[in-house]
């Protein structure tokens, strides 16, 4: 039994030296799905958020999907939504999140920015998405 334990310990040490990684689980990287229309107003509304995503590098996994494509419609339905929704931001598969003050926020429709169409203006901002992701990136 000691031989087996010694062998497994030596194997783990060798793998760590060769790969540079431990056998412990790697830290979880948040997945952000941006389901959005590809029209100019949507692109402009999401530009600051996309720039922030890019600045995070490998701390985030970002997946972009045209919400009007068959794949986008299928993903929208998978999270229980349908209809004319120009933007959905999913963080680890969820569009509803808790703020630090305990209130719930939904990352649906346009962010609450000047010039956003009133009928599809959400109650979220780029800072809200950043706050949720910043907290999420701190988690192991």
Language model features by range: what are they?
Residues 19-24:
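Sec/Tat signal peptide C-region and signal peptidase I cleavage site
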Residues 25-56:
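Local sequence-structure signature of Cys/Sec-based thiol-disulfide redox active-site neighborhoods
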Residues 58-72:
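Thiol-based oxidoreductase modules, predominantly thioredoxin-like and allied folds used
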